[in-house]
Amino acid sequence: MNYFPWLTLVVILPIAGGSLIFLFPHRGNKVIRWYTVCICLIDLLLTTYAFCYHFQLDDPLIQLTESYKWINFFDFYWRFGIDGLSIGPILLTGFITTLATLAAQPITRECKLFYFLMLAMYSGQIGPFSSRDILLFFIMWELELIPVYLLLAMWGGKKRLYSATKFILYTAGSSVFLLMATLGIGLYGSNEPTLNFETLNNQSYPLALEIIVYIGFLIAFAVKSPIIPLHTWLPDTHGEAHYSTCMLLAGILLKMGAYGLVRINMELFSHAHSIFCPWLMILGSIQIIYAASASLGQRNLKKRIAYSSVSHMGFLIIGIGSISDTGLNGAILQIISHGFIGAALFFLSGTSYDRLRLLYLDEMGGMALPMPKIFTVFTILSMASLALPGMSGFFAELIVFWGIITSQKYFLIMKILITFVTAIGMILTPIYSLSILRQMFYGYKFFNTPNSYFFDSGPRELFISISILIPIIGIGIYPDFIFSFSVDKVEAVLSHF
């Protein structure tokens, strides 16, 4: 047994290292930026080392467990542990955060605070994926809200205060339901609070209590995922945030809600989930079509990509609601796949904005010739977004479809309707994806403008783009790499149904 506190080190290192930024006497941005990148890279390497040498893929039980008494009066423990469900999101968090800090080079105002908030957000996002105590899960869930709010309010567009306020109202409001559900389930049936995930997983609850608590958690996770109609904060937030912040929001933050649905709603409240899963399937199907249709009507490039993220999250919701090992594995693959694709699309939209200072698609055009590298990478990522075979999104959506068909939970007519509606959404996806390419890169609007001069992607931007493209194509060719983490844990989760 390994007794070294790997997970505590991985969670604490970013925020502890970020605190040292304020001690730097150097005022230049370059030293601070590379220090931040090094902290993220060291944390990612530590995570990778711990998983490679101390994690057994064929063991569905919790591994790398840590348990330290934190508050004696409240009997509150600092509990960490991982399994096949959390290993993928943790690695995704480290990878995307490292690239996001590297992408934030144009930030020059209050750079010490900016990079500290990026590192604090890193710790706050790893925390929920590795927590094995439900109250610690809540604390970590709340910890990452503060950096996100400040990143939105201080670095963004003209309406950044409005979008930051809307974000905090939605997320803080949903956190009230999360706290009530956490305390309700932790204090049930005992004089002392029961907060350990393993203990909660082995308890049985009255169906009425299970449904009430399930709804509380569902609201909290539906805001973060997001699930319609609790999604309206997302387009405004993405439309105003700096693109490095958008990479963290699309790549990681949205996936926390989906992870919570599987980790808590499915694993702890199987009876309630069996009742609500048909509604999740219906909501997911509607979400795919609604968000894809709404994306077509957006003039703002970042808002169009944001609505495409909402649409793709619909597949994830369907996979969670299918209650089949195929569908749930597809949902987990979609978490990883869209984390890469969404982050990459927002990065490229930001690099385009740095050059043109334009976000409205009807004001763009003709960018393919002066910026061929950006055009090439954006085209490849658009193909990945519309689930082209050979890209990670193809297998994720295909396996979710197969999960619907093979699910034993639903009648044939329900399967046909869900599949038909979802297929319509998949037809809309290439329409808005190819529309972005047409409006941005084709035509002669900019190419014929007198005295126009553009810089194409530099080495830093090409490195970030290629770094994200490699796992997108790699997973598309060999998706079993992700399934090797999750398949045993998925069977353990579905054994409760």
UniProtKB/Swiss-Prot annotation:
Keyword Lipoprotein recorded: no
The EC number(s) given in the record are 7.1.1.-
Membrane disposition? Multi-pass membrane protein
BP GO terms, sorted: ATP synthesis coupled electron transport; electron transport coupled proton transport
Answer yes or no on keyword Chloroplast: yes
Q: Which domain of life is it from?
A: Eukaryota
Record field: transmembrane: 4-24, 35-55, 84-104, 111-131, 134-154, 167-187, 208-228, 242-262, 274-294, 305-325, 330-350, 386-406, 411-431, 463-483
Q: So what does this thing catalyse?
A: a plastoquinone + NADH + (n+1) H(+)(in) = a plastoquinol + NAD(+) + n H(+)(out); a plastoquinone + NADPH + (n+1) H(+)(in) = a plastoquinol + NADP(+) + n H(+)(out)
Q: Output the Gene Ontology cellular-component terms.
A: chloroplast thylakoid membrane
Q: Which UniProt keywords apply?
A: Chloroplast, Membrane, NAD, NADP, Plastid, Plastoquinone, Quinone, Thylakoid, Translocase, Transmembrane, Transmembrane helix
* UniProt subcellular location: Plastid, Chloroplast thylakoid membrane
Gene Ontology MF annotations: NADH dehydrogenase (ubiquinone) activity; ubiquinone binding
Coiled-coil spans in chain: none
The cross-references to HAMAP family, in alphabetical order and at most eight, read: NDH1_NuoM
Query: NCBIfam families recorded for this chain?
Result: NDH_I_M
Family, similarity comment: Belongs to the complex I subunit 4 family.
List the protein's name.
NAD(P)H-quinone oxidoreductase chain 4, chloroplastic
Source organism of the structure = Lotus japonicus
Gene from which this protein is expressed: ndhD
